[in-house]
């Protein structure tokens, strides 16, 4: 459940309830704070996406979920401008997965061309 849907549905708990009602597997939810992450786990989220672009936020969520004994029951994802050099630090901060959308969307285009040398349509 994306952060805009969380707002439209009235908060993290309501968004997770809506996601669980669909019944298509673990609910993933974007959070922006430790409090939202803890609430999300309590509401049954299976994947917590710390989408703040700040590894300190990810580390704080990871530490708090560990402290509360909740970390083993949930996967942590991290996003927000992730670059290749961020993968190691994200893993060290507790990420099980990373969102590399920007790296893909902002990748330089390849200049490709195709030349047909012969064609046989018989």
Task: Please place each PLM-identified region on the residue numbering.
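Alpha/beta enzyme core
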Residues: 3-7, 13-27, 32-47, 92-93
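Glycine- and other small-residue-rich loops at beta-strand/loop junctions that grip anionic moieties
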Residues: 8, 29-30, 50-51, 79-80, ...
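Conserved strand-to-helix beginnings and helix N-cap segments that scaffold or border functional pockets
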Residues: 12-13, 110
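Short beta-strand/loop segments at the ligand-binding rim of alpha/beta enzyme cores
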Residues: 20-28, 64-79
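Catalytic cores of alpha/beta
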Residues: 35-46, 53-63, 67, 76-100
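Short, structured secondary-structure boundary patches
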Residues: 51-52, 69-76, 118-122
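Flexible C-terminal active-site loop/helix
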Residues: 89-122
């Amino acid at each position: 459940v994306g952060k805009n849907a969380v707002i439209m549905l009235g908060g993290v708990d309501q968004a997770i309830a809506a996601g669980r009602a669909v019944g298509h597997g673990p609910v993933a939810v974007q959070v922006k704070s430790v409090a939202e992450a803890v609430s999300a786990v309590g509401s049954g989220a299976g994947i917590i996406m710390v989408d703040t672009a700040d590894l300190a936020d990810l580390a704080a969520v990871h530490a708090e979920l560990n402290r509360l004994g909740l970390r083993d029951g949930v996967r942590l994802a991290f996003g927000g401008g992730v670059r290749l050099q961020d993968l190691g630090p994200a893993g060290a901060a507790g990420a099980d997965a990373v969102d590399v959308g920007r790296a893909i969307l902002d990748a330089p285009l390849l200049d490709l061309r195709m030349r047909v040398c012969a064609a046989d349509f018989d």
